Amino acid sequence: LPISFIGNRVGVWGLLKVIDSMRKYDLNVDEIDKLTGPVIGRPKSATFRTSDVVGLDTLVKVANNLYAGLPNDEGREMFKLPDTVNKLEQNKWLGDKTGQGFYKKSKNAKGETEILTLDLKTFEYQPKAKAKFATLETTKTIDNLKDRYKVLLAGKDKAGDFYRDMFFDLFKYVSNRIPEISDELFRIDDAVSGGFGWDLGPFETWDGV
């Protein structure tokens, strides 16, 4: 299978799983981008900033195509877009190309540019908030990514709950893709790392855990 197909299949499923876990543990956009960025070896743009840069319409198109084309995928329901994403698309809040998405640039009273974040419950923008979690504080001195995963997944707070839910479901999903989309684990890792900018692919991450 083409590498872009493998990357999208796992990467988009993983992104939508992040939103699923976010709802489960009542986290917000700022918190998710803090939890899913460089601390877990993913780009600084993390989840929602990445969506704004790429364009939500692209994500919607890929997810809808995967949902339609994979009737036998046991994880298919994850490709069914959540209401929040559908509402963003209906509003044409697609990200940078339309001037607003999960984030929006605005001028404050002093004429300075500030970044506002979308509250997915009220659909109103509010000033970007600093996300803090005890689990993240404990990893500040850990440079090795695989060592960091162990600490993150053992977290006793909401961040730990989020990581366990998100990663364990991702590991289950990718293990079921062998041999369906690839005979070799490394091909899935390479496709996701290359396409989505992850430092470690899902199987390498699992190894680390």
List where the protein language model places each region:
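N-terminal glycine-rich phosphate-binding loop for ADP-containing cofactors
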Residues: 1-209
